[in-house]
Swiss-Prot record:
Residues 72-81, 373-384 have a biased composition (Basic and acidic residues). It comes from the Eukaryota. The lineage of its organism: Eukaryota, Metazoa, Chordata, Craniata, Vertebrata. Changing F552A: Abolishes mRNA-binding and cytoplasmic retention, localizing predominantly to the nucleus from early development. Also disrupts DNA-binding. This is Interleukin enhancer-binding factor 3-A. PANTHER family: INTERLEUKIN ENHANCER-BINDING FACTOR 3 (PTHR45762:SF4), ZINC FINGER RNA-BINDING PROTEIN (PTHR45762). The gene is ilf3-a.
Amino acid sequence: MRPMRIFLNDDRHVMAKHSVVYPTQEELEAVQNMVSHTERALKAVSDWIDQQEKDCSGEQEQPMAEETETTEEGKDSEMKTGENPTRTLRGVMRVGLVAKGLLLKGDLDLELVLLCRDKPTISLLKRVADNLVLQFETVSEDKYEVIQNIREALIVVKSTKEPPLTLNIRLTSPLVREEMEKLSAGETLTVSDPPDVLDRHKCLAALASLRHAKWFQARANGLKSCVIVIRVLRDLCTRVPTWEPLRGWPLELLCEKAIGTANRPMGAGEALRRVLECLSSGILMPDGSGLYDPCEKDASDALEHLERQQREDITQSAQHALRLAAFGQLHKVLGMDPLPSKMPKKTKVETPVIDYTVQIPPSTTYAMPPLKRPIEEDGDDKSPSKKKKKIQKKDEKSEPPQVMNALMRLNQLKPGLQYKLISQTGPVHAPVFTMSVEVDDKTFEASGPSKKTAKLHVAVKVLQDMGLPTGMEEKEEGTDESEQKPVVQTPAQPDDSAEVDSAALDQAESAKQQGPILTKHGKNPVMELNEKRRGLKYELISETGGSHDKRFVMEVEVDGVKFQGSGSNKKVAKAYAALSALEKLFPDYTMYTEAPKKKRPPMMPRGGPKFAGKHNQGFGMMYSEVPPPQAMRGRGRGGMNRGRGRGRGGFGGGYMNSGGYGGGYGGNYNYQTSATAGYSQFYSNGGASGNAGGGGAGTGGYSSYYQGDSYSAPTPPKPFVNKKPPPPQQQQQQQPPPQHASNPPKPSYNQGYQGHQGGQQQQQQQQQQQTYNQNQYSNYGPPQKQKGGYNQGAQGAGSGGSYNYSNSYTGGTAPLGTAVERVQEGEAAALTQRQALVTTQAHTPAMVEPAVLRRTKVTRSLITIKVPPDRTTVALQIITSSLREELGVTAGIQNTT
């Protein structure tokens, strides 16, 4: 698995630093020569001591009978730990940096452990050291200096030439550990130690180093990047004094635990950052978890030698190093200069590949018993899984390489490219991704239904720009039919196996490049074929290829004809077989079209029809000369044309079971409480469009849909003139009625704006129909020439749409013919610069806006009201004393200011 791209820069810096601190080939050769010479000399010393002991004991055995002659490399005289239990010197083993392969440039101290049969003594150490000088002269021409260090229980061997290497040979025995375990268990020792025995703690430390070397070879050497990170951190411990206490076994154990617990192999940069994260977490702190030593029977902390201040200093330094690495300054942690972002192209030079894991080959003089039995190549008990793997490897070598797409080709040519997501458009079910990549200071962009497909298209563009093959040529040269059609095999033509194989290879290659296999209708071929022929069975005909590039051939029989398809898996092969059957048996199959969905009527735009191209003059809120619309759904629970209300009335479900928010086509705001909600008559006003009420007046005025008193916005009358209005006969002569005036008017409780031509005649109709207008206040409008009565809405065309707020009194209608006649004979005047309306009725208070009562004269037959234009709104309810008996109500004045 390749490292993550976000750590590529860190990997480059870590590997560059590692190449600097790694020892040169000359240094490694010098270490190898000194170690091998010492091992061969110790083997000769062991033979000499064993021969002397046999001569002294009188035994007549030939100690060398089972051994072959020693060659120059010392490969034939191997002494293993378990094979020579009677020898005084049982074997020599590499430990420390030599065994673990952690040598750095400038490391001059090497270690070996010499195992003894009995507890090592001072006399044994001197005998070995004295004879070792003689054996060096016979083994090698190089001169070595041998020094005895009894206090440390070791023999020091120094080289006399450059580099001045030092090799420490530690003497120990497994009996020292066994006696320690017995003492800890409370047992008494029956055998007394010799008086000149070496220091027990030094011997135990040598045994521990031997266990550490075995554990490291088994756990850390095979872990990717672990040895490299340890070498880099060993250099850090040398350069930074804060890290010095961590050097050695604790550092090795910590790196193995941090890197080995990852869920995937990591590069050198990512592995180093993971170790820094582990240290930064506070694992070294006194209250931390500590570090368990796996090479000890009893639970022990490998960090117990660290002091509290040292733990805090190392943790703080690791946190600082982690911050630097996070901000792209890992070179400061490594103590090196930053590398350029783009490395210059270098000519390829054949250099030997260096194995950074193994620095020095294993010893051949004293061979350690292997941790596991070697695989017997010719044995009958060879694992069958091993055989299977070898067979698969042979098959993989013999098969052609896997077909590469454009993205794979580009990654081979330009590794480490960064693909960026530019945009994501389209709906959720069909998104379109746009990816870009920068190659050689050029930016390429492409789109696709997924990020992966978009990246593939970008790679195709890059390869085309470079003039390199993209892997799509075969698909472009051939037609779609020749690519996707598998060979059809009928029972009468069974000799098409070669053609099937060639088509199978083409299908497999095109499948990898084209993505999912779909029919011309965008469906899965197997699903579409199953819709036409149920119960089809797909059979596997053949399976070829290696484990990494399988080829499957599937066959299906449809209507007595067999169709085959091939692919890299059974699913793809089935799809191509079904696709072949569809194209052969159903070539003219039309695409399935869904049933047309029920279209909703167009919603009325906000703001009403004032945005329409054609409407009545003035501030109207209704369309002119427009037919009634279809039923429109709103947000309420009403009828077909739902409004905001909850009524279940007819079209234009209203606020209180009738009326609606924009109930009419013109969009009047009707808030009515009438229980007689019904279908509004659009053409009840003699064909005039607008919100005409059911059975409305004979003129084309704007009024409410429903029966009841309407709320109109008439234009204000002219200033006060003490002149009586002309009789109805004269008005009829002066202004002829409209075309629809001849129709007999229907009785209605509804009255809105009157037409400009039928104003006077409608005044008479109002007197006959006993129309009740309530709560009328006007909107802005031009002044009219004709005066309107108190019981009429302001006459004239040109005023805008009306806001109808009706309450629809349906009970207790008193005969007001006398009252209406008396009111119409009165005189009224209003001085105002804004719209004003004065109305007197039996049940509705008159609204005056803006006006205040100046003087009220109550007479038996006349009511006079004068209002100034600069006062606030007042509401009057005037009932003359002469009408009290007729109306049965009381008179009063109500001021709402």
